[in-house]
Regions:
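Membrane-interfacial amphipathic/re-entrant helices at transmembrane-helix boundaries
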Residues: 1-21, 49, 60-70, 97-101, ...
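Single transmembrane alpha-helix segments in multi-pass membrane proteins
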Residues: 4-53, 85-101, 239-245
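Transmembrane alpha-helical segments in multi-pass inner-membrane proteins
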Residues: 18, 68-77, 200-207, 217-284
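Membrane-embedded helix boundary and interhelical linker motif in transport proteins
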Residues: 31-85, 89, 265-273
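Hydrophobic core segments of alpha-helical transmembrane domains in multi-pass membrane transport
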Residues: 47-52, 75-82, 107-117, 154-163, ...
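Alpha-helical transmembrane segments within multi-pass membrane transporters and channels
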Residues: 61-109, 116, 250-255, 259, ...
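Transmembrane helix-bundle core of multi-pass membrane transporters
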Residues: 93-94, 99-168, 195, 261-280, ...
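Helix-loop-helix "hairpin" substructures at the membrane interface of multi-pass membrane proteins
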Residues: 143-221, 225, 245-251
Length: 307
């Protein structure tokens, strides 16, 4: 029972991070119908920027909360600037192009970000200095740290704030109107370019925060870390129903639970043939199953259009 509960705790924490990243995919897809495969690499940039700031301030007289706050702010500013720039330079000129063109462009931007990061930070893993030691608690035989609690609560708070913003503010209503019909929204006086830029801005900010969370959780950063993370977050968005904000939240949490439970029990289920390092396979197995049996996702609406 304690192993099961432990995997549930780990899965919820991991899933909350996936959900934050998945929101970036689903918001852009909802507005533009574009799969922004560069989003995972924006998360990577945020993580490496945060690591750089933390390493620079580690050992100084600056308090740890200010170090983490400064690292998060720097990551958000860099990622938001990159996100808006990518939208303006790479995606906006292709808005009326065939759907394959922006998709290929997104993959190209992803590769560009990866190798630019490799030039700036090298291809080596970058370790997080031990700036704090998380306190550990025991619940029904399972352990949980204050860092895990902080990550989960912060992620849930950010997701709830985004849902409230989209539902109750004028800008949020403009985003929903643009998602439903951009042409009609433009005729009603909504600045479509501004809404699209804000969508990239919000998604990039959430991605930067997710990158900081990953660095704190795993203690490592790498120029290639955004690739697998991005695919998993995309899987979460598809699982929940891409284009649906609450679907991305649900999909992220479910994917985290599936991955964590698979990691905990795969050895027993396969007689030791497969280890926990095969847990990534389950994320992509989920993607295949969802695309075959429920391509609209758990909360998405079915459509007659076929790829």
């Amino acid at each position: 029972m304690d192993i099961f509960l432990q995997q549930i705790i780990n899965g919820l924490v991991l899933g909350s991070i996936y959900a934050l990243v998945a929101l970036g995919y689903t918001m852009v897809y909802g507005i533009l119908g574009l799969i922004n495969f560069a989003h995972g690499d924006l998360v990577m940039v945020g993580a490496l920027v945060a690591l750089t700031v933390i390493q620079a301030l580690f050992g100084s007289a600056v308090p740890v909360p200010l170090i983490l706050g400064g690292a998060t702010l720097a990551a958000m500013l860099i990622c938001m600037t990159l996100g808006v720039t990518i939208e303006r330079v790479a995606y906006r000129p292709l808005r009326r192009a065939p759907r394959l063109a922006p998709l290929i462009t997104a993959i190209g931007v992803s590769i560009l970000l990866q190798y630019t990061a490799a030039l700036v930070w090298s291809k080596q893993y970058i370790s997080l200095p031990e700036i704090f030691k998380p306190a550990q608690y025991t619940i029904a035989g399972a352990s949980i740290t204050d860092l895990q609690i902080f990550i989960f609560v912060l992620a849930c708070g950010l997701m709830a704030a985004l849902l409230w913003f989209i539902k109750h503010t004028l800008l949020g209503k403009a985003m929903r109107a643009t998602e439903q019909n951009a042409e009609v929204a433009g005729l009603m006086g909504i600045d479509i370019n501004r809404i699209v830029a804000l969508t990239f801005l919000f998604g990039s900010a959430l991605g930067a925060i997710a990158g900081v969370m990953i660095v704190l959780y795993y203690g490592l950063g790498h120029y290639y870390m955004g690739f697998i993370l991005g695919l998993k977050a995309f899987t979460a968005a598809v699982l929940g129903g891409i284009g649906k904000v609450h679907g991305a939240v649900l999909g992220g949490l479910l994917l985290g639970l599936i991955e964590s439970l698979a990691s905990g029990y795969i050895g027993d289920l396969t007689g030791g043939v497969l280890g926990s390092n095969y847990r990534d396979v389950f994320a992509f197995l989920v993607l295949v199953v969802v695309l075959v049996f429920r391509p609209s996702g758990l909360v998405g609406e079915t459509s007659g259009e076929r790829a």
